């Protein structure tokens, strides 16, 4: 009896030790799910409520792949960025209109504690959601071909199917008053129901140090939300939350002008790209 009990305990201990890494991943997942439910709450309106009800965005399903500690950290950073960005969008109070175009595109802004001034672009694009996803995610590195505000985007590392580390080199703006900037960011992509969320924020990547002659700026929690326009599923409602610390000394009036104009120009260039470039088999 004693020998049988000993073998049972020893076998259980061996299996426990062998599965410790998997258990750690499960713990990360469980904590993420709990944080996300608390952050988003039960009173989320519209598409935000749909995202929350379908599944926890922060508690994503980690693949069977065993990630390193650094990779797990990047995954968590991306999901935290998504949580924070969606939390900002979910708060409807305090938004002020920066600009509105004749086609209905508008930019709003507000001050967010511990983040600073954020900008919110609201547009409707006459293309299905999967087409936008293809251009903004699958063809991310080609953005410099159609968006003159971006010189280059390069994927530095892919982690699973949802997370990437990127380096972005932005062009000078405002008649060279704002010199070239670059960004190193972690980006996370999720779909829940008919809504796609693309989120990100600044991170550190040892293999991409600061570049000579370029100021290393930082994205705060930022995201794009894509979902079919109500009543017109062939069109897409795009909401872009932009939060950036450009670094260096710049007047606030210049910063506000550059960021709001950047969003308007992005929408215009995106439409032209979608009209000119054929779609492939893409699905968000």
Curated annotation (Swiss-Prot):
Molecular function per GO: cholesterol binding; cholesterol transfer activity
Tissue specificity remark: Expressed within glia and neurons in discrete regions of the brain.
Compartments, as annotated in UniProt: Mitochondrion
SUPFAM superfamilies associated with the record: Bet v1-like (SSF55961)
A GO biological-process term: positive regulation of gene expression
Positions of post-translational Phosphoserine modification: 56, 194
Pathway of action: Steroid metabolism; cholesterol metabolism
Residue interval of the organelle targeting sequence: 1-62
PROSITE patterns: START
Pfam families xref list: START
Residue span(s) of domain START: 66-279
GO CC term (a single one): mitochondrial crista
Function per UniProt: Plays a key role in steroid hormone synthesis by enhancing the metabolism of cholesterol into pregnenolone. Transporter that binds to and transport cholesterol through the intermembrane space of the mitochondrion.
Subunit structure: May interact with TSPO.
Name the record gives this protein: Steroidogenic acute regulatory protein, mitochondrial
The organism of origin for this protein: Mus musculus
């Amino acid at each position: 009896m004693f020998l049988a009990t000993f073998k049972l305990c020893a076998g259980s201990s061996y299996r426990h030790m062998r599965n410790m890494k998997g258990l750690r991943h499960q713990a990360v997942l469980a904590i993420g799910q709990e944080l996300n439910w608390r952050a988003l709450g039960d009173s989320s309106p519209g598409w935000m409520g749909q995202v929350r009800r379908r599944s926890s965005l922060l508690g994503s399903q980690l693949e069977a792949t065993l990630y390193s500690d650094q990779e797990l950290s990047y995954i968590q950073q991306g999901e935290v960025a998504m949580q924070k960005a969606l939390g900002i969008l979910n708060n409807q109070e305090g938004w002020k209109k920066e600009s509105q175009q004749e086609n209905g595109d508008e930019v709003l802004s507000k001050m967010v504690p511990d983040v600073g001034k954020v900008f919110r672009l609201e547009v409707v694009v006459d293309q299905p959601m999967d087409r936008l996803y293809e251009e903004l995610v699958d063809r991310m590195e080609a953005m410099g071909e159609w968006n003159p505000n971006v010189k280059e985007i390069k994927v530095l590392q892919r982690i699973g199917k949802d997370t990437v580390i990127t380096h972005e080199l932005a062009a000078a703006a405002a008649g060279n008053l704002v010199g070239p900037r670059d960004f190193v960011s972690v980006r996370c992509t999720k779909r829940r129901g008919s809504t796609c969320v693309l989120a990100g924020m600044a991170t550190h990547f040892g293999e991409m140090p600061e570049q000579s002659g370029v100021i290393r700026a930082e994205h705060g929690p930022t995201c794009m939300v894509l979902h079919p326009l109500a009543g017109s599923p062939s069109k897409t409602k795009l909401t872009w939350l932009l939060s950036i610390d450009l670094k260096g000394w710049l007047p606030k009036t210049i910063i506000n002008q550059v960021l709001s104009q950047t969003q308007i120009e992005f929408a215009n260039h995106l439409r032209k790209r979608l009209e000119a470039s054929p779609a492939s088999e893409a699905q968000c």
